[in-house]
Each structure stands twice: as C-alpha cells, then as structure tokens.
C-alpha cells in the first residue's frame, strides 16, 4: 500500500581536514589548548557537512540487482499481477452472469474483487517498474500523488470489505430469519458505498493539505506525519482486523453451539416410506390402538425429519461460508500485519521526511500484502462449488447454458443429500 522509493543522485560527502604544521609560536601551548584550536583550512561549511554525515543517510539505499535477478524478480511479480487480474475478473464475471450467484450478500464479494482488481491494474505495474530500476520513482511528482491515492484507497477498500463480510456472515449465522440485509439488495449496496467512502476519507487528506506526501526528486512516499500515520493505519487496518477477529471468534462459538443442537443419527428409512400410513388398514380394529399410536408417532417423526432437513442444509451452507471467510481473514492477517506494523513504526524511528528502513525488507512486506489480492479469489474458487464450476466453464469458453448446467448440478447434489440416512436427535 505504501511505497517508498530512493534517490540515486546522492553521493557521500568526502571531507579532508588539513592542519598546518604548528609554528614555533604554538610549540609552547599546552596540549589542551592546541586541541581546541580549529584546523587552519577548515571552513564553517565543512563542519556543517561533517555533522550531517554523522547522521544516517535517509533515502540513499538502492535495490541493486544483477541481470539474472531482475529477470527472475520481473517474471515472478508479473505472474502475481496477471493471476490477480485474472482471478478477480473471473469472480466479477461469474457473479454477473450466473443467476444463482446474484445474491445480495455477494455484492460484498464483487466489491472485494473490484478492489483487488484495481490494486493489480492501477498499482502493481508501477511498483514492479520501480523495483526493477532500483527503487527510483520515474513517473513524476503529479502522478506520485495519484498513485498513492489509488494505492491507499483500493487496499483500504479491500480490507474494509473483508471486515463487512465478516459482520455479514456472523449475522447470517446467528440471525438467519431476522437479518434483512441478506435479502435486501439496496441496503447491501449502501454498505458497499460506505466502505468506499471510508476508504476515500483516508486517501484525501494528503491531497488537501493535511500531512502532505513526501514528493521530491525520484522519491514518492506516503505522508509520514505522526498523526496521519496513526489515523490511517488504525482506520485502514487495526480496527477492521479487530472487528474481523471478534466476529469470527463469535462465529466459531455460535457454530459450535449450533452443531451440538444438530447431531445426526441414523433413522431407519422404513419410517419415511408412505407404506407406514397404510399399516392400520391391514390390522384388526380392536388390536389397532397401540399400533395406531406408534404409526402416528412415526409419521410425526417423518414429517419432522423432512421439515428439518431444509434447516440442516442451511446450517451446513452457513458453516461452510463461515469457514471460507475465516480462512480469508487468516490469510489477510498473515499478508498485511507485518507491513502495517512496519508502516506504523517507521515515522517514529526515521522521522517524517523519509524512510530509513531496509529497502529490501519494505519491498518484501509490501508485496506480501499485495499477494492477498491474489489469494482471495483462489480461496473463493476452492471452497465455493458454484464459483469453481463457473470458473472452469469460463476458462474453457463454455458460456452457453451455464445457468442450466449449474442448476442440473445443484439438483443432482440435492438428490444425493436426500438419499443419505440423516436425522436430528
């Protein structure tokens, strides 16, 4: 999200301090008196430059790669970018063309894919070029501000969307009958709009005077102002991460409690057959009372099984969605936490004008964060059968009748579930 690039025009300051051979007038001076005298040829400017060289050179380090390293790094980063574009584009296309996937809760999935796709298209290519030329910003001061704005807004939108998804899944599991947003497309669209509005609130301050970006020759770095750093990292990462962890902790507890209520036992399929309702006609009237009572109990149990089987299906589907999003949140934390820890500490260690952190470390953690935009669609495709099937059909250019094929596959899966010996204790 945050990019720091280094200037190449800085050179070490070489200072030569000359002292003349002491004359006879100086020979009688005490050693302490002689040492306090200023060297004869040393100027005020030399002393000022000497004091500056005692401080760490900020922004001097470059990424120096050999030809082979540049090729390998360029290929790897380009593959990450291309796969990120392809994966997130497939998610958006799949939700748009498949009726089964056009659910209000999937608006958030599309928003997440759009944010990740924007990172891959508008941010990653410029970071690749900057890294391959050693860390120098080659695109000018004006575009530096545009680039930082796109970087911050898209990455923040991705993170905040994950946060809203966690809240959506939690409410969907704990309040499946009363949570209206899952059936209300307009309300979900408003939530997506709020996510992008909050992302813009972090992007705009440096463009309007508060906490200006570090934008000098061949250097493009987001503002290192202390207040802005605390505000931006808290809103963009720490608060959303805390909300996600709390939501999934509650989801885990709720799923565990629900699992205890939905223990499965094998119930003989005899009681689900229609023949059970005809037994009383085959028995004598006087000997039918106990049998009739048993038949009524079995009939009620059979009806209860059929009624609750639908609830079981919903319960399993929500559990799977929670597990999928739990993995996504875990991947998000792994990818972004190291970078944001470094970004938060950087201005307090290096000051507000530049970065003194090891450049290779910064770039590695930055690309680890960008990789999260690649991981998200892969996780969805792996855990969502409908999305995975749609991906496969799109990659094989089988666009026609895709909704019909998905409906047939879903019906086949439903029949397989119906044939299982399931019940509720």
Swiss-Prot record:
Locate the transmembrane regions by residue number.
Answer: 73-97, 108-129, 142-167, 188-208, 227-249, 323-348, 360-383
Q: Which UniProt keywords apply?
A: Cell membrane, Disulfide bond, G-protein coupled receptor, Glycoprotein, Lipoprotein, Membrane, Palmitate, Receptor, Transducer, Transmembrane, Transmembrane helix
What's an example Gene Ontology biological process for this entry? Answer: smooth muscle contraction
- For the Extracellular compartment, the record's topological domain ranges are 1-72, 130-141, 209-226, 349-359
Q: Where is the lipid attached (S-palmitoyl cysteine)?
A: 397
Record-given protein name: 5-hydroxytryptamine receptor 7
**Which family does this protein fall into?**
Belongs to the G-protein coupled receptor 1 family.
Q: Tell me the gene name.
A: htr7
Q: Which InterPro entries match?
A: 5HT_7_rcpt, 5HT_rcpt, GPCR_Rhodpsn, GPCR_Rhodpsn_7TM
Show the SUPFAM superfamilies listed in the entry: Family A G protein-coupled receptor-like (SSF81321)
Q: What does this protein do?
A: G-protein coupled receptor for 5-hydroxytryptamine (serotonin), a biogenic hormone that functions as a neurotransmitter, a hormone and a mitogen. Ligand binding causes a conformation change that triggers signaling via guanine nucleotide-binding proteins (G proteins) and modulates the activity of downstream effectors. HTR7 is coupled to G(s) G alpha proteins and mediates activation of adenylate cyclase activity.
């Amino acid at each position: 999200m945050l990019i720091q690039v280094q200037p190449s025009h800085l050179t070490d300051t070489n200072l030569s301090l000359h002292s003349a051979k002491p004359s006879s007038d100086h020979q009688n001076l005490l050693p302490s008196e002689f040492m306090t005298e200023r060297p004869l040829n040393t100027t005020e400017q030399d002393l000022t430059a000497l004091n500056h060289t005692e401080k760490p050179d900020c922004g001097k380090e470059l990424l120096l790669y050999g030809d082979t390293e540049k090729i390998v790094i360029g290929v790897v980063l380009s593959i990450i970018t291309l796969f990120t574009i392809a994966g997130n584009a497939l998610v958006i296309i799949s939700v748009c063309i498949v009726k089964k996937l056009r659910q209000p809760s999937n608006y958030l999935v599309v928003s997440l894919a759009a944010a990740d796709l924007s990172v891959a298209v508008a941010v990653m290519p410029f970071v690749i070029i900057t890294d391959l030329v050693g860390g120098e910003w080659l695109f000018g001061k004006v575009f530096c501000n545009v680039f930082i704005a796109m970087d911050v807004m898209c990455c923040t939108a991705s993170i905040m969307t994950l946060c809203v998804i966690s809240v959506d899944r939690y409410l969907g599991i704990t309040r499946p009958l009363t949570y209206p947003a899952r059936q209300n497309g307009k309300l979900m669209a408003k939530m997506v709009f709020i996510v992008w509005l909050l992302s813009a609130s972090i992007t705009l301050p440096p463009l309007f005077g508060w906490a200006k970006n570090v934008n000098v020759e061949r250097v493009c770095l987001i503002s290192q102002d202390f207040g802005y750093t605390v505000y931006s990292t808290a809103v963009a990462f720490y608060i959303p991460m805390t909300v996600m962890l709390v939501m999934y902790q509650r989801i885990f507890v709720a799923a565990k409690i629900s699992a205890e209520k939905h223990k499965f036992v094998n119930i003989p399929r005899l009681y689900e057959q229609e023949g059970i309702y005809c037994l009383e006609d085959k028995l004598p009237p006087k000997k039918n009372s106990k049998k009739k009572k048993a038949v009524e109990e079995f009939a009620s149990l059979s009806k209860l099984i059929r009624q609750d089987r639908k609830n079981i299906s919903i319960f399993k589907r929500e559990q799977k969605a929670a597990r999928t999003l739990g993995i996504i949140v875990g991947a998000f934390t792994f990818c972004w936490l190291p970078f944001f820890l470094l970004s938060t500490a950087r201005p307090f260690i290096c000051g507000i004008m530049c970065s003194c952190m090891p450049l290779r470390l910064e770039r590695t953690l930055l690309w680890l964060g960008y990789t999260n935009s690649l991981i998200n669609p892969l996780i969805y495709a792996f855990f969502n059968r409908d999305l995975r099937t749609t991906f496969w059909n799109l990659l094989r250019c089988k666009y026609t009748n895709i909704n019909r094929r998905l409906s047939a596959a879903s019906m086949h899966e439903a029949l397989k579930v119906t044939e299982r010996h399931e019940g509720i204790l």
